[in-house]
Each structure stands twice: as C-alpha cells, then as structure tokens.
Amino acid sequence: MQTNEGEVEEESSSQVEQEDFVMEGHGKTPPPGEESKQEKEQEREEQLMEDKKRKKEDKKKKEATQKVTEQKTKVPEVTKPSLSQPTAASPIGSSPSPPVNGGNNAKRVAVPNGQPPSAARYMPREVPPRFRCQQDHKVLLKRGQPPPPSCMLLGGGAGPPPCTAPGANPNNNAQVTGALLQSESGTAPESTLGGAAASNYANSTWGPGASSNSGASPNPIHIWDKVIVDGSDMEEWPCIASKDTESSSENTTDNNSASNPGSEKSSLPGSTTSNKGKGSQCQAASSGNECNLGVWKSDPKAKSVQPPNSTSDSNNGLGNWRSTSGQDRIGPGSGFSNFNPNSNPSAWPALVQEGTSRKGALETESSSSSAQVSTVGQASREQQSKMENAGVNFVVSGREQAQIHNTDGPKNGNTNSLNLSSPNPMENKGMPFGMGLGNTSRSTDAPSQSTGDRKTGSVGSWGAARGPSGTDTVSGQSNSGNNGNNGKDREDSWKGASVPKPTGSKSDSWDNNNRSTGGSWNFGPQDNNDNKWGEGNKMTSGVSQGEWKQPTGSDELKIGEWSGPNQPNSSTGAWDNQKGHPLPENQGNAQAPCWGRSSSSAGSEVGGQSTGSNHKAGSSDSHNSGRRSYRPTHPDCQAVLQTLLSRTDLDPRVLSNTGWGQTQIKQDTVWDIEEVPRPEGKSDKGTEGWESAATQTKNSGGWGDAPSQSNQMKSGWGELSASTEWKDPKSTGGWNDYKNNNSSNWGGGRADEKTPSSWNESSCKDQGWGGGRQPNQGWTSGKNGWGEEVDQVKNNNWESSANKPVSGWGEGGQNEIGTWGNGGNTNLASKGGWEDCKRSPAWNETGRQPNSWNKQHQQQQQPPPPQPEASGSWGGPPPPPQGNVRPSNSNWSSGPQPTTPKDDEPSGWEEPSPQSISRKMDIDDGTSAWGDPNSYNYKNVNLWDKNSQGGPAPREPNLPTPMTGKSASVWSKSTPPAPDNGTSAWGEPNESSPGWGEMDDAGASTTGWGNTPANAPNAMKPNSKSMQDGWGESDGPVTGARHPSWEEEDDGGVWNTAGSQGSTSSHNSASWGQGGKKQMKCSLKGGNNDSWMNPLAKQFSNMGLLSQTEDNPSSKMDLSVDKKFDVDKRTMNLGDFNDIMRKDRPGFRPPNSKDLGTTDSGPYFEKGGSHGLFGNSTAQSRGLHTPVQPLSSSPGLRAQVPPQFISPQVSASMLKQFPNSGLNPGLFNVGPQLSPQQIAMLSQLPQIPQFQLACQLLLQQQQQQQQLLQNQRKISQAVRQQQEQQLARMVSALQQQQQQQQQQQRQPSMKHSPSHPVGPKPHLDNMVPNALNVGLPDLPTKGPIPGYGSGFSSGGMDYGMVGGKEAGTESRFKQWTSMMEGLPSVATQEATMHKNGAIVAPGKTRGGSPYNQFDIIPGDTLGGHTGPAGDSWLPAKSPPTNKIGSKSSNASWPPEFQPGVPWKGIQNIDPESDPYVTPGSVLGGTTTSPIVDTDHQLLRDNTTGSNSSLNTSLPSPGAWPYSASDNSFTNVHSTSAKFPDYKSTWSPDPIGHNPTHLSNKMWKNHISSRNTTPLTRPPPGLTNPKPASPWSSTAPRSVRGWGTQDSRIASASTWSDGGSVRPSYWLVLHNLTPQIDGSTLRTICMQHGPLLTFHLNLTQGTALIRYSTKQEAAKAQTALHMCVLGNTTILAEFATEDEVSRFLAQAQPPTPAATPSAPATGWQSLETSQNQADPVGPALNLFGGSTGLGQWSSSAGGSSGADLAGTSLWGPPNYSSSLWGVPTVEDPHRMGSPAPLLPGDLLGGGSDSI
C-alpha cells in the first residue's frame, strides 16, 4: 500500500500538478484558492512530487510488473512513458484501474489491455516521432508535474500505476484513485475505473501515449500494438476489436481514447452495461466514442458507479469533471498530454492529438469518469480535453448521466446510436464528448452533464447542444446520434450514423452521423448542430470531419479557423494551439486545443484526432479513423503528417502553419481525409472540430471555448477560454456559460473576445459569433449568451426558432441550430448550432454562404470585419433575420433564421452590449454602427478596421476579429437593424442586415465581402461570386457582375486578394475583399493565373530572372531585400498589405507608412481607392505605391488615375528598389494586363529590383484593377488576354531589361530613386522625371522613366507613369500639373504628391485602379499627373504653402520635389490654422493617413483640376478617360469643388480614421475654402456635368466609394465616423418610426440651424438633413443622437456624401439608373443648391452631387435603395450599387462607358443611368 500511498501521494501530487497544470495552462482550476494552493504546492511539491513520483513510479513499475501481467507488458512501456508522466499516469491509471474493473477491474484492466491494443493501435498514429519527442519533452518539461497530469490524463494516478494496477494497481490505485478521485470525483470507482481504464488504456496507450506520448512514444507503438493484441482480447475487445477493430481499433485509434475507449468503452459500456463485450461492441460502434467507451469501459463501471456521480458528478461530476475535471480536468487534461500538446500544440497535434489527446482523453475520460473527476479532471483536461474524455467522461458521466443513453440519450436514439456504442458509451462519449468536448469544454461542461443537464445532452454541452449533439460532439456518434438527435435531432441521424459512425470514418462519421445528415458535418449539417462542422460541411460532409479543415479551408475558415484554414493549421493547430491550446488547457478538451486537438481530442474521440490534430488524421476519427476508416492503425502520425504535407489539395497555409499546430494539425489532412469511412467517432466528433471545439473545449476553444472564454476568449475561442473554457466558464456551459458571460456568447464572448477571432477570429470572430450573433439573434439570442438565454431564448430562439428554425444558425441547424438554439439548451447543440448552422452552411458550406462562417466569415470576413456583427453576420444576418431574409438566414444558414429570434436579437451575440445591440438592432444601426460606432461597443466602427480585425486573419487571424468582435457586432448589430442599416447597405444589405454577411446570404454571396473569401478561397471561389456579391450582395444588384468581377478575378482583385490574405487583411481589404482571401489564392498562388504563371515562371527562370529574386540593386536600394520582399509580399498579398494598411487604417497607412507620402497617399487612396474602395483602397494601401498601376495599357483609360491609386500600393521602399533596377518601362506596359499573380511572379525576378517593384506596383494595380474588373467581369477576359500579352511583353522587356538593367542601374537617377521611395521627395524627384508619379515615378526614376516613358507612354504609364505625359524625362509632376490646369500649382501638387509619396499615384491608382486598365494608362494627362495629381491632390489642396490644406488652387500645389532638395511639400500643416487644410489633407497629409491626405488632396486637387485626375480616379477611372482630357480636368475641377465636399465626406472618413476631428475641423474650414475652390467646379453635380461625369465615372467615384469603400473599410467607422462624418453637413437620423411626425422632426432639426435639406424617408426609418455648416450639423447630431422622439430613439449620425447619396438613392427607389436621376434630381436640387451653398453640398454633389450623389443615390437606390441611406450608403454600395453600384451596374464597364462620366447630370440624371 505504500505504493498505493505513494501512488496516492503521487496522485495527489499529480492532482496538484494537474491543478497547477490547470492553473498554468488552463486557468480552469479548482477554486481560486485551490488554484493558488495548487500553484504553490506545485512549486513546493513539484520536486517532491517528482521525487515521489519517481520513487513511486519505480515502485509502481515494480508493482505494475507484479500486478498485471498484461499491464505489465504494457506497463513497462507505460511506465517508461509514465516515468515522464509517471506518477500521475500511474496513479490515475492505478486508481482508475480498480474502479475500472470495478468488479472486473482487474480483469478488465487486463482486458483493457485491450486498451493497450488500442493503445498499440493508437500509438502509431498517435505519436509521431516528432510529437513523441514533444510529448516526452513535455513530460520532461513538466517533469514531475506533467507526468502527473499526464498520469491523470492517463489515469489520474501515475502512469506506472496503471501498469501497476490493473490488478493490484486497481486495488491500490483504486484506493488511491478512489481517494483521489473520489475526493475529486467523489467516485472512487470511477476514479479507479477511469484510472484503470486509463491506466490500462491510458497507461498503455495513453499512458504511454500520454505519458508519452512521450515516453511511450515508442512504446506507444508497442503499446499500441499490444493494445491491438489486446484488442484481440476478446473479452472486452472482441467487440471493440471486432467492431472496432476498425472501429475500435480504428476508432480506438481514432480516438486513441476512442480505441481505447473502445475497449474501455466497452468496459464502460460494458460496465455500464456490465456487459463488457457488449459494451465493448457498443463501444466499438462507438468507437469513436470508444474512447469513451474504452475509457468508459472501465470507467463505466466505475462510472456506473460513478454514473450518478457521473450524472451528478457528471453533471456535477462531470460537473465534477467540470469540477474536478473541470479544474482538474483541465489540469490533467491538459494534464499532460494535452497540456503539452496544448502547450505544445505541435506536440499534441500529432501526438497528443491523437494519442495524448485521445489517450489522455480517454484516460482522462476514464479517469474522468472515474475520477472524472479528479483524475479525469485531473487527468485532465487533456483527457477531457480529449474530449473524449470529456466526452467520454462525460460520456460516461454523461452516459451515466444519462446513462446516458440518454444522456444524450436525451437524444436518445442516441443511445441507439450509441447504443451501439453502447449507447451510453457512445452516448456518453458522444455525449460526453460532447460534453466532454463540448462539455468538457463546457467544462464540465459537464455542463452538459453538469451543466448539465442541459447539458446533458449537454454532453454535450455541445453535446447537449450537441447535446446530444453533444454526444456527437464527441462521438459524434452519439453525439451524432445525439446530435443528430439533437440536432436533427436526430439521434437518428447521428444515431444511425452514429453507430456506424463510430466506426465509420470520420467522415463517415460525420457522414454517418450525418449521414443522415449527410453530411458529415453534416452531421452537423444535418443537424445543424452538428453541423457542427459538418453541416457546413454538409457538403463536406464526409469530409467533414476531416473537413473541418476543409471547410475550413474552404470556408470555413472558420472552421478553418478552427481547423485549418484559419490558421489553418493552426487552426487546428490554431485551435489547437491557439485556441485549443489554451483552450485545451483550459479545457481538457480544449486540448484539442485546437481544433485539432480539439478535434483531436474531440476528434480524438471520435476521430477526434481528426479534427484535432488530426486533422491530420483524418477525420480524426481517429486518425485512423479518420484516416480512418481503415487505418485502424493509424498511420504513423509522422506518416500522416507527411501525407498531409504532401497533399496538394491542402491549403498550404494550413500546412504551413508553424506555430500551433504546425502542420501537425493536419487539419488539412484530416480534412482531407475525409476519409469517410468511419463515421465513427468522428462522428460525433463531429465536430471534431466542433467537437473539439465542441468539445469544446477546444471548441471551446473552438466554439465553445471561446465562448467560454469568452470572456476572455480572447484567445480565440478556445484559448481563451481555456480554462475558462467551457469548463470554466463553467461553464456551464461553456457555451452557455460563456455565453452568458459573454453573453455575447459567442458573440459576446466573441465579441468579447473580440477575438472573435477566434473563430474567425477573423471572421468569426466574433464576428461571427459574437457579434454576429449578436443579433443575437440567434445564438444567443438569448441574450445571454449562448446559453443562457439562449437557452431560453436561444433556445427559443435558436432552438426554437432556431431550433427548428433551423433556423438556427443552422438553418440547418434545424434544431441543431436549434441546437444552437436549442442548444440553448442544447446550446450545445447549439453549438452545434453554430456550427451547425452556421456551419452548416457555413462552415463547410462555406458556402453556404450561408454564410457560413465563411460566409459569415466571409462576410465577416472581413469585410465584415465588422462583421462581427456581420459576422455576425450572424448577427447581422440575424438581423436580417429579421426575416429578412433568409439571407440573413442564410447567413446563418439561415440560421439567421433565428432571425426570428430577432428578438433575441438583442442579445445577439453581440450582445455583449445588449444595449448597444439592442439599440443597434433596433435601430437602424447599421448606420449607427456606422455612424456611431462609438455607441456600439463593438469596436465597431471601425468595423472595417476591426475587421481588419485582425483579421480574421486568422489569421490574423481573426484579426478581424476584433473588429469583428465589435465590429462584427457592429455589423451584426447593424445588421440587426436589419433594416437597412447601412450595413444593410453593406449587406445591402441584402437583407441583410447581415450586411456583410448578409450578403452572404446572398448567396452566399454572401459574404459578400469577405465572406466568401472567408470562405476561403473555396468558399470564396464559389462564393466568390457571392462574395462578390457580397459586396454586393449587392452584388446582386450590383451586380454580380461587379462582384463577380471583383471576385471573379480570383484575385478578387483586391478584394479577393486582400481578402485573401487579407482575409485578414482583411481589414479592409480582406474585409472587403475578404474576398481577399481569395486573393491569396489568386495572388501568388496563382489563383486563376497560376497556370499562366507557371509557364511564365519557367520562362523567367530560363531567363535566369526568376532565380534571382532579390536583386543586388534591390539590396542596394535602401530597401532591404527582406523588406522588399515584405513589400512584395504585401503587395502580393494585398490583403496582407491591406491588412497592414488597414490596421494603420486610421492613417490608412500602408505598412510602409514610413513612406509616408506614398503610404499616406496610398492609404487614403486606399480609402478612396479607385478600386473599389475595397479593393482599391486595399490594393492601394496595400500597394502603397502602385504607380505601376498604369498597368493598363490603354491610356485612354484612367490610367492616370489608377497609377495614383496604385502608387500607394507599392511601398516607397519598393519603389526605391524598383528604380534601382532601371527596368525597362516597357515591362510595365504589361500593366493591367498582367494578373497580380503574374506580376507577383515577375516581381520575384531578382535581377531587376525595379522590375520587381514595378511588378509589385503592377500587381497591386492589377489587383485593384482586377477587383474592378472582377466587378466587371466582362473586362476580365480581355484583360486577362492583355495580361498575358503584356506578360509576354514584360518578359521580353525583362530580357531587354536585363541587358539594360545594369546601365540603368548605374544611372544616378535610378539610384536616386531608391531615396525617393523612401521619402516623398525622392518620390517626387523620381516622379518628376519619371512621371511615375508618386512612388512609381520613383521606380522609373528619371533614367528608367524615359524608358518607361517610351515604354509606358501610353500604356506606359504603367508605372506610375500614368502616362502622364509620357514626359519621360519631364517631371511627371510638371506634366501632370500642366495637364491639370497648366497651373503652377501642379508642380506643387506634384511635390505634394511626392510628399505624400506615392500618394498621388495611389490616387491615380485609386481612381484608375478599379478600372485600372483603363485609367492606368496615362490616362495621359490624367494618368500622367494622376499619380501626382492624386497625390498632389491632397497636397494640392493646400496652399502653395505646401500645406495639404492648400486648396486645389493652382498656387496651392506643393512645390515639386527636386531630387537633391528637401521637398517642402505639404508637411507640417496646421489643421487648425491652415485654411486650406482638409481633414483628408491633414490626415493624409503629413500625418497619419497619407491616404486620407491623398484623398483630400485628391478632392482638393480635383478642385484644382489636377485633382481632377485624382478625382476621376477617385470617382472613377471611367471618368478619367474623359477626365483624362483636359476637359476632364476641367470637369474634374468642377468636380473638384465637389470633391472637396466630397472630400469632406471623405474627409470625415479619414477623419474617422485619424485626425478625424481635425479633419472635420479642417473640413469645416477647409470646406469653405474648398468651396471657394468651387470656382473650379461648377456647382457640383449640376453645373458641370463633366465634373459629374468624373463622378459619373464616379462610378469609380463610387469607388470613391473608397470613401465608401475605404471608408467603410478603413473605417467602417470611418464611415460611420465618417458617417458621422464627423463634421459633416449632413446628418442622417436613423431608427425613425413611421409614427414620427416629419414636421415635428423637421422643427426639432431646425432648432440647430437652417436645414438646407430635409429628406425624410420613413420607410427607411431615416431622415437626411443637411445643415449649412458642419458646426450646426454637429450640434444637431449631438442633440439628436439618442434623442427619444415619440416611440423611438433617434440615432443621429453624420452622413458622408456617399451615405447621403445612398440615402437619397434609397429614398428614391427608382431604378438604380433612374434612381440616380430621381434621387439625383432630388438630390440635385438638394445637393445643388446645397452644393452651391455649401461646400458640403458640392461634396455631396461630388458624391452624390450630381454624379456622385446621384450615383450613389442611384447605386444606393439600386443596391441599397432600400437601404438606409446612411446605412444604405454603406449598403448601397453594397458597393454594388452605389459605390460600385451604379457603376457597378455598369461598373464593369463603367469605366469604359462615358456614362459615368456623365456629368452632373448625374444628379439630375442619372449618372447612374448613364
């Protein structure tokens, strides 16, 4: 007994360690006090423990040898591993053993050697060498502690004990365990059982696995083998073996735990069932569960005993789990394996993943069960994490709980399903898993159990929700069943599936499960819940499981998030790590840390692995399983990894992740795997991802997690939670809990988390979830979070509504969704819900646009960035839920269905800030969000930025998230308003409130924004259209053309591109683009151009160009190669760049802000980005300077403009480099024709740095252009051809270049260039000579430029040449300026431009960008000066003083930059004192956002005339062509006047960013002065049609949308802000009810000043008011905002011109074309007079102003006519409409068509129509 005592001690130590572990890793720990204690103890006892453990281990080894022969065999191995883990393992093992055996313990234990067999099987897949090491490492790291946790995982006790124990150990252990466990669990038997099982199992497999995974690593294999042998062990194993040999074994393998579980499970079931064999079989079926089972097997008995405990415990116990486990769980779970994995995702992915995870889980499970508690708990989190364990545990517990059959039995059928799996077990498992996983996550998730019950189903918490889904969760099977049940209720589905599932492959599993569902995820899908992933997968279906990743990838990103995509690997890994990691730690399950693990864990269970790390494995389902199906033996992790790595279909990103999951996660792999076969386990797992996630833990991490964490969440989902995790959170719900807490629930949490990231972080990110949900809608409607309210509400909502509503997210979710909904209760299910639902579509669906996450994401995607809400689309959509639209729903999957929940809405994910939310929701927040981002917490405003979020990036992940979070929320929120919220507009909002997301719906379009992208490329792709749509949603309206166009290009142009990477980048780009995501794919990846690229690459390679990526010159350039590359990267990945930019957003600074000028311009432009805002700006920002833009060869096109836009895209440094090379300008002629990918490739030709720069520039331009083109798909084909031709030209040029290069390089100017790039001056210098304008000019530098000049001349502008005049040698600036107006100011302008760096170029680019090809070409004059002009524009505005503020007046142009002379440019403007300063100028100008500056400059410049080019650019390259002509300039000038106003609008945007206030102030002043400028412009739209025309062009202007777009993007808030416009003459009152008396409202408004315009649109619930001064408007806004009038609370926001235009457009719902006129007219008068009267008017005019407005209007009308104006604004653009919108409509050709150019008429007439 000494040993026992020692064991006990060890166990205690283990526990302590575990706790410590928990504390450390999970945060979930016993009570805080305990935690502290544990910590202290840990420190104090660590050594002691280690020593004791060692001693004990030695003893145990001896005992083990003595005690159990089989075990003995196994023991040594175990022991060895255990050594690492040792004591812990042993004790647990030991303790658990007896309990396991309960009666049969000894025998059982022996049988559990079945476990060993399992283990043996597992081992291979479980521990790849690399992981092994890690595992070991971990163990070692932990030294004493980890082992204990491991042990705990394994058994709770020490690893050795297991050895020791099967026989004796069991007793001893039992005692010990009992003591420990009991204490902990309160169930000795369980503990023991768990231990035993764990022991055997764990020890064997787990032990080793866990333990070692490290120590056992090798052993594990042995063990595994043994296990397998044991598998033979008929008694227990037969079933399992047989059933599972595959199942079991596979499952087992799958689950590691599962397998083991299988055995164990058998036991479990057996125990429970009593019938080992039988149980076993069931288990086998379960197999996935198996783990559970296996574990349970032993456990079960104990469990049986425990059951109550379990139940209670479970609930409780589980709870305990939660409790114990919870804390312990964490500890242990994390305990060791997991922990390590967690900590060491990499380790775990493979190892843990499977093994550890599984094992741990199992063990844990066992333990859990047993100890469930402690051990388990202790065992850990890991175990728990394992989900399995948790699941299992839960299972057990749950099962027990339910007994689970029911438990999830609740699902009952589940049972059936499980049944097979021992229903219970399965169930358990599933459940547990669910629970565990989920629950676990829940922590206790027990919530399920514990939580309950609710959980019961909880189990799955997820479970529950998963509920049964939960079960599924884990098991998927059961879960499936359950889930199915749950969710589909269907146990059935699951169930059936389940059963088979267990064995089935993961995919299967899912499939099976889903089978019914059909879908793997389906499972989920099926259920929504399950959906879990599945669903989304739905399609993925089988894959689902595996899919996770896939979905992820595809779509889901989210999943991806989870799984791979997101982080992709990371995802899982991410989850794993990220989330999971923490999560796992937190949760045992979490472990799975990542998804992977999570999955793993969860997956493990069920394939958990699969998901989990496994993803690699396949489904995970076991790996094997996943890989499953057959594969009983899992392939070696290593092998799997290899496979994964070698897979071509995987997203490299996923694989590539280094961190986290490293590749390990294999999410992809797994996904890939899909294998279907066994539904098994995976099934439940189903979620594997979910599961894990669900499991939550991970999930939690994943979903859960986050929530749980929710709070924190930060981490990601899971991570944060981690402890919190579900569990912690107590989870309770994890979701719930989290929910609760978070309220946000996802949202909340997410929101909270902000992270959202987590999910999508990016997307989701809260986005989604959180915010998104927000609207709650959904999800949680319940306000609470998921849970809570959810429950009810949620439940209701979701469930209810959702629920069936399927609504739920799921839509599919059907219930699942319901689950979600249900989930409320089910919450879990819910989880699933989300998953499901969302997933359902979403996830996988990707497409689904449903938004799916992806969608959502997509939506969210960044564009949504804000999404969050949007992502929320979820949320948002939800709003739409309004019914709105399914889209919304769609979004949700319909989930929005929940729209219904609209009620819920309030809580909405977003909820976090209910108030806001509600407000938001209620109100038209779209705008509000926009306008008042502040109001909303949700970061909102920036929405964009937020979105940027970070992206989802998960990349950034989820960076976006943040935004998302709030933002998302915002979006979401906005969404809620659904009404149109501006978001709507966004969404257009489609219904959308979803806004972005909504879009989603749209078709998935969804996601318009990003969504698609989010979806990832996949989604994107498919979606892409959608996405595009998304934009448009509008897309729709807008056109698909446009969108598609946008999207279309794969690149999505910026969109995509940005999105692509940008997913994160998102931010804007991404966001917008998110689509960007696509980009990624597109971009370097080649996207669509890939094919050409390869040959091209080959050619270059042959030429020797390719290899020398970095050129000496480059090096020379002051830009370092790395930097250059970075730049390239950025440029390539617009998204990324964008991201950066976006982040800088405020400044709109490209990453290379330093290149202030350039950057500034870029960013601002970015805003304006001709591209569409979105793309363009993105591109721009991204590109920074993309003078190259001139890509487009046709000069007529707004080449001039685009360059401006482009310039910004390229970083100055890049430019610098570029010049070094002296490339042949001719190369750049490729300009627009080349695809970004091509360009990117070209840019890699090292020999010619300049070339590279040029390529980058071109790439950026093209991206922008492509976006535009995509908008106008028609063009794209031709463009593509052109690109190819140009590419060919470029190649030949390169060849020449190589020859010429050195000479050129020698040219001083060239060298000078580098300098230029750095500073605006250099740029200027270069520009002047090069006429590259802005950054680009630098590239060519004088020497090269001439070449360019010749080469570029018309097409040539290419670089930034913008053709400009092709002056070649003559300074572009000069040329441009002369062109502009021949005004001297031009020079200044150029200087300004230079100052801004590439700003001008960006401006050009921007303008031209969208239509880059058109514009780019020098747009001759325009083009030529475009860059500069653009840049200048900003500067131009400022007086000659060089202040940005200077008006466009010619005199104002900043001095031209002279290479040797410091450029005085526009620096140091005192916004306060400088009358010429405009907000934009200020922002863009010296300070922060060059972009802004640029914008302003553009605007001003417009005034100047020079600006006109910019203007055009901004407005629309289309205009440029005309604009290009002098007349255009003139027009521009006219426009200019408008521009300023416009600008003001923009300004606000910028203002929003940055110095918004300054800008505003400036604006105020400026505007006046600008107004003065009016001389240039006739009354805005009216007087000069031409100007209008530019705007007409405006389509581009639309782009101007930059404003919009950018604004939106840059700041949604900006818009919002901007919307608020900070000081804008226009106020948009939202949330008006039809009962409001217009006259009263008008009277109230008049109290603050004379109303130039009062446009009441009660149908939109909005009123557009224009004051004569911004001050009045500001005063009115302050007074009116949140003012309670009648039965509503008015939201007053400043409206930007764009918004106004939209508003008007909406107001006049005439056809878009017509609208413009109508609105235009309406506007016109409005605007006109206003314009004349007030600069703002003109600005409006600009925008709206005649053209602009009209356009906007129109677009708005079209797209968003309905949209709120303000919102609408956003919406409308939808870009499609408005922004792009109108043009959109014609966007595709808008450029080409003069119509846009149409003037002012626009207002009156129809710029749109024109």
From Swiss-Prot:
Predominant place of localization: cytoplasm
Claim: Coiled coil is one of the keywords in the record: yes
Keyword match Cytoplasm: yes
Cited SUPFAM superfamilies: RNA-binding domain, RBD
Comp. bias intervals (Gly residues): 809-824
Biased composition (Low complexity): 88-106, 165-174, 207-220, 248-260, 335-346, 363-380, 416-425, 475-486, 1295-1307, 1792-1801
Biased composition (Polar residues): 180-190, 261-290, 306-327, 438-451, 504-528, 564-575, 611-623, 655-667, 774-783, 793-804, 846-857, 934-950, 964-975, 1004-1027, 1057-1072, 1175-1195, 1604-1617, 1722-1733
Region of interest (PABPC1-interacting motif-2 (PAM2)), residue spans: 1449-1467
Annotated InterPro entries: Argonaute_hook_dom, GW182_domain, Nucleotide-bd_a/b_plait_sf, RBD_domain_sf, TNRC6_PABC-bd, TNRC6B_RRM
Region described as Disordered: spans on this chain: 1-221, 235-1080, 1141-1196, 1293-1329, 1568-1619, 1706-1740, 1786-1810
Region annotation (Interaction with argonaute proteins) ranges: 37-1028
Residue ranges of the region described as Silencing domain: 1191-1700
Biological process annotations from GO: miRNA-mediated gene silencing by inhibition of translation; positive regulation of nuclear-transcribed mRNA catabolic process, deadenylation-dependent decay; positive regulation of nuclear-transcribed mRNA poly(A) tail shortening
Biased composition (Acidic residues): 1-22
Keywords of this entry: Coiled coil, Cytoplasm, Phosphoprotein, RNA-binding, RNA-mediated gene silencing, Translation regulation
Residue list for modification Phosphothreonine: 1426, 1441
Domain RRM residue range list: 1625-1697
Subcellular location: Cytoplasm, P-body
Residue list for modification Phosphoserine: 913, 1409, 1438, 1793, 1809
Annotated GO CC locations: cytosol; P-body
UniProt-recorded Gene Ontology molecular function terms: RNA binding
Family, similarity comment: Belongs to the GW182 family.
Quaternary structure and partners: Interacts with AGO1, AGO2, AGO3 and AGO4. Interacts with CNOT1; the interaction mediates the association with the CCR4-NOT complex. Interacts with PAN3; the interaction mediates the association with the PAN complex. Interacts with MOV10; the interaction is direct and RNA-dependent.
Name of the protein this chain belongs to: Trinucleotide repeat-containing gene 6B protein
Lineage: Eukaryota, Metazoa, Chordata, Craniata, Vertebrata
Gene it is expressed from: Tnrc6b
